[in-house]
């Protein structure tokens, strides 16, 4: 049994070698000749999986170690009776913490308290739901927009995108990319609703590049529209607009979900799915794979102020560390993917044990994802 895995899937060799021969390969471009004798293919979001890649190949199972799967032609796989699995929610925590890191940058630069702002979340699935929960735990006003969930009658108060555009100080997008149908999210932000968006708003996209019409956004910024913009995803990738890159406040190379924990969850989820497929069920405890972080414990005193929160968040991950490298090399062919391939280890807040002398501080930190204790 031969299993082909993306070389950027941590722990894939360690896990899949128990099942057969494992070969790690680049995801873009994927060496198509390797598929001639491959039984299972494990990819990440940079690999387009469709008839062009797999027609006539012996592959019987495709797994993507990512939450989204718009890079996979699932309808074609189903027609060919090729089993498929994704990793829903695997990097949700990482994306939430990316958004918080960016918000702490703006809060410091502009001198605002997050609790004085209204955050509009578009797409309230694994990422958006977790983001809303953490923001609310801190006392931040949140407006939610999720038409599919609203239509299902889910037990939440949902608002229209137009309401969020008008009322939210911060807009962050966590919707899947749908290019057709009732819940079309292609160019959800476009020229017409950029006109509606008041000046001074913060716009964050860490979902899919095409959710925002990048040409329309660039045009608005060139015309003097005053917006603070964070883009982790681009239209197109990897050949993003250098002009737009130079206009946005924070720019990163599609790495919002790239924590070690998030990647490891993706690997373990598709590993477990493949084990089920071949009739050898397994369960992997993430803690058995992850190393101890470089900074594992810190002590804090007093109440949880925004200043303290910002220090803790940026101790674990400061989004600006990923902005500068992209700006340096974005115009060089292949460098966007290299930044992703050789991405430095990044951990989640839960990897940091925070020892607090204030029980309320410990409780709040635990509520938003830190590993806090009161002593």
Swiss-Prot record:
Pathway: Cofactor biosynthesis; pyridoxine 5'-phosphate biosynthesis; pyridoxine 5'-phosphate from D-erythrose 4-phosphate: step 2/5. Its main location: cytoplasm. CDD domains: ErythrP_dh (cd12158). Substrate binds at residues 45, 66, 258. GO terms for cellular component: cytosol. InterPro entries: D-isomer_2_OHA_DH_cat_dom, D-isomer_DH_CS, D-isomer_DH_CS1, D-isomer_DH_NAD-bd, Erythronate-4-P_DHase, Erythronate-4-P_DHase_dimer, NAD(P)-bd_dom_sf, PdxB_dimer_sf. The active site is at residues 208, 237, 254. NAD(+) binds at residues 146, 175, 206-208, 232, 257. It is found in: Cytoplasm. GO terms for biological process: 'de novo' pyridoxal 5'-phosphate biosynthetic process; pyridoxine biosynthetic process. Keywords: Cytoplasm, NAD, Oxidoreductase, Pyridoxine biosynthesis. It catalyses: 4-phospho-D-erythronate + NAD(+) = (R)-3-hydroxy-2-oxo-4-phosphooxybutanoate + NADH + H(+). The keyword Chloroplast does not apply. It comes from the Bacteria. Gene3D superfamilies: 3.30.1370.170, NAD(P)-binding Rossmann-like Domain. It holds the Pfam family 2-Hacid_dh. Belongs to the D-isomer specific 2-hydroxyacid dehydrogenase family. PdxB subfamily. Homodimer. PANTHER family: FORMATE DEHYDROGENASE 1 (PTHR42938:SF9). This is Erythronate-4-phosphate dehydrogenase.
